[in-house]
Regions:
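Positively charged n-region of N-terminal signal peptides that target proteins for export
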Residues: 1-4
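Bacterial N-terminal signal peptides
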Residues: 7-17
Length: 148
């Protein structure tokens, strides 16, 4: 009985020490139609901690997700999925990451992942994006700045 108690205590301690290393998992759906319109990511803004994973799910086919060049932290890792394929991205470097769907960027299918402190927020310049995507990124950046 005493050995069982010691083993249980060891397992519990190990779980506490190891679980932060794995981080939490978040889900972003790639949709033709959702709560905020057509051709969207849901949610379009995800706030996470360093070490967390975002699972981009191609719920509706014909979408992909990629980080937008020049709109991620300087030491952040770019990411990209093939068309109609899911993608898991573990984020380590803090900051703001802009992501988009190549075929649907012109209609505003873009979003943000904010990892911890959004230190690079003032370096994000969406002016090179199509008008709808630019407008959406500006609105999402305003939400991050306002803490909403």
């Amino acid at each position: 009985m005493k050995q069982l108690g010691i083993a249980s205590a060891f397992v519990a301690a190990w779980m506490v020490l190891v679980s932060p290393a794995f981080g939490e998992e978040f889900r972003v759906q790639e949709l033709n139609h959702g709560p905020n319109g057509f051709f969207i990511f849901d949610p379009e803004l995800v706030r996470i901690k360093s070490g967390d994973t975002v699972h981009f799910v191609a719920v509706d086919k014909g979408h992909e997700v990629h980080s937008v060049p020049g709109m991620i932290p300087a030491k952040g890792q770019p990411f990209s999925a093939n068309l109609s394929q899911d993608l898991d991205v573990r984020f380590v470097e803090p900051g703001v990451y802009v992501f988009a769907c190549r075929p649907h960027t012109p209609v505003g299918m873009v979003g943000l992942v904010v990892v911890g402190d959004p230190a690079n927020i003032d370096e994000i310049n969406p002016s090179s994006l199509p008008a709808k995507a630019k407008s959406k990124i500006e609105a999402l950046l305003a939400r991050v700045r306002n803490g909403s």
